[in-house]
Every structure is written in structure tokens, then in C-alpha cells.
Amino acid sequence: MRDSVFIYSPSYQTYMFHQEHPFNQQRVLLTYDLLKTINAFDDGDIVTPRLASEEELSLVHTDDYIQAVKLAGAGKLPAEEGESYGLGTEDTPVFAGMHEAASLLVGGTLTAADWVMSGQALHAANLGGGLHHGFRGRASGFCIYNDSAVAIQYIQKKYSARVLYIDTDAHHGDGVQFTFYDNPDVCTLSIHETGRYLFPGTGQIQEKGSGKGYGYSFNIPLDAFTEDDSFLEAYRTAASEVAAYFEPDVIISQNGADAHYYDPLTHLSATINIYEEIPRLAHTLAHQYCGGKWIAVGGGGYDIWRVVPRAWARIWLEMKGIDPGHEIPPEWIVKWQKQCPVALPSSWSDPADLYPPIPRKPEITEKNAQTVSKALYAIRSEQQRTK
């Protein structure tokens, strides 16, 4: 058994809406190249993804939607019909070959799932995945097919496993949550910026599931301008208590890197420090409850130069137990600086004065603590009753 595998293909770059679109898969290449530069890969660590089949996509997505995506990518879907499927919008424009490009990202997460669930590897990372806004019959928020949702259904069908999905993207993991809203064998936890200010506007504490799945959806909507300490306190508390409550067979973590202060689309005030702690706890919980079974995917993250490579590299470094030291390799900076519109960071950490002090910090911290308490009230009440 390998400790970890890294699912990667240069073809991930084909998932490209247009040059000005904020969703840019060059960030996966930048992360891969940073890890390669610090010699973080052993022989056999890199695994090529496969294409997801239409049958696999249909574990989540409707047949008519899959056909619409194929037609759109071939330039044969009328614009009005495309919009009814969320295709051809400002968020999710049509591009040539979009079905194949999106199927490869899903196939990457399925590849990761098979490596982990078959016992070939303890951990697997597919940073090209994490497209958590995709719905059964509709594209949304840059996401065509929902790789995590397809992988969870695949794992349940093939391996009969209970799945804990932990999402730390700044945007609510709506597509995954609502796919499994009535499923008691899938527990979703999303820690995100409140939907009062940010797409998709969902992810309230009251969204707890339905039917047999009631009580297996957890949401921690954080206030705008939340900083490291408050974010990590919410994450540690919620992830630890939810994992203990659900006792999963495998953990899938979605690792959006858009809670950072630099991110142009969100309003949180985290630094790179949280992206060292987030995978560390996921790793610990996987060994505590799942025999180590941990699948990590990417997600959001729109400062593709200064934030995403360092944040996502930390996932692989945690899996492999590698300490990268303090400095980013100068040769990586030299290689990419000419393409980068801002100065690339020279350190794995952020400076202490990254941004000016947040005036509402005590109020924000207290509000977030109350949110966590409300979200976990049912778990804690059950624990009190069974003592």
C-alpha cells in the first residue's frame, strides 16, 4: 500500500471558460510545479486520471443534462435551451469540449476514490476537482459536473461506505449538500462565508437535511472579515464533533482556497496559516475514524498566484509528512514571475501585517462562536442525553 497518490494531468488545463474568467486551472499546474520543485513526489506518486463515463456521471446528473453539456461543447445547443441548464451564463460560459474537460475532472476524483477505497493508498489528492456547485440537472458557479457528489455516490454503490464530506471553501457547498440531503449515510459539513453577502446564498444553520437524512447536514456560516483564529476554532470544533458523531468510513475534504484575504471574490480575512491546519486535522480525523481513508479535492481559489499554490501544496505535504521549510524555492519564483501580475511570495507563510486590523474582530469572533454552538446543538444535546 502507498501512503498517498497525487492525481494529475496537464489536460486539466482544458477546463477553461475563457482567458478573463476567474476560474483558472493554471493554479493546479502552479501547485504541481511547486511541489515538483521541492522534490515532494516519489516514484509512482503521480497517477493519471481517467475520464468518467456517462453512466458514472448519471449517478448524480440527469441524462438530459449530460446530453445538453455534450451538445453545448460541440456548439450545437441553442442558447435559450442552454440557459435553462445553467450553461452559457456569465458564471458558466460554454466552451468547446466542455463535456470531456469536465468528465476528466470527475474521473480524477473517481480515480482517487478507487485508490483509497480499494486499499491501494491511504490518501489521494485530486486538486483539479472540488466543483461543489454542480446540481443534478444544472451547471452553477463555474461547475459543470459535481465530481465530489459523483464520487460519493460511486463510493456508496461500489464500496457501501459512510462518507463524511468536509467543505472549507468560502462558498457554501450547495450542490453536494442538496444531492445527499435525504441520505443518512452521507454527512456534509460546510464552513463558509455567510450567504448574506456571497454566492450561492445558501448554507444557513437551519439547513439540516430532510427525511432520513435530517441531522446529517451541518453548516457554519461565518461572518465577513473572519480571521484565522476564529475560522480555525470553528473548523476544529465542528469537524471534530461531527466526525465523532457520524463515525465515517472515509473522509472527502473539499479545499477551496478562497477564504484568504487576497481572494478577489470573497470577504473573509484568513491568511495562509489556515491552509496548513485544515489538512492537518482532516488527516488526523481520517486516521482516528477511517483507518486513514482520506480523499482531498480542490475547489475555489481565485488568487491563483499568491495563494492557491501554497495552500494546495500543503495538502500533499501533509499527506506525505514533508516539511517544506520557510522559503519558496527561488527557481519556482523566477520561472513564473514573468507571467504573474503581482510579486510572488518568497515564503510559505504570510507577513504579520498582511492587512490592517479588523475593527469588528471581537464582535465577529463572538458571533462565529455562537453560530458554531447553534449548528452543533443537536449533537451536544444527544451527548448529554446519553451520558
From Swiss-Prot:
It comes from the Bacteria. Belongs to the histone deacetylase family. CDD domains: HDAC_AcuC_like. SUPFAM superfamilies: Arginase/deacetylase. The keyword Coiled coil does not apply. Role in growth and sporulation on acetoin or butanediol. Involved in the breakdown of these compounds used as a carbon source. The keyword Cell inner membrane does not apply. It holds the Pfam family Hist_deacetyl. Keywords: Acetoin catabolism, Sporulation. The lineage of its organism: Bacteria, Bacillati, Bacillota, Bacilli, Bacillales. InterPro entries: AcuC, HDAC_PDAC, His_deacetylse, His_deacetylse_dom, His_deacetylse_dom_sf, Ureohydrolase_dom_sf. GO terms for biological process: acetoin catabolic process; epigenetic regulation of gene expression; sporulation resulting in formation of a cellular spore. It comes from Bacillus subtilis (strain 168). One of its GO terms (molecular function) is histone deacetylase activity. Pathway: Ketone degradation; acetoin degradation. Coiled coil: none annotated. This is Acetoin utilization protein AcuC.
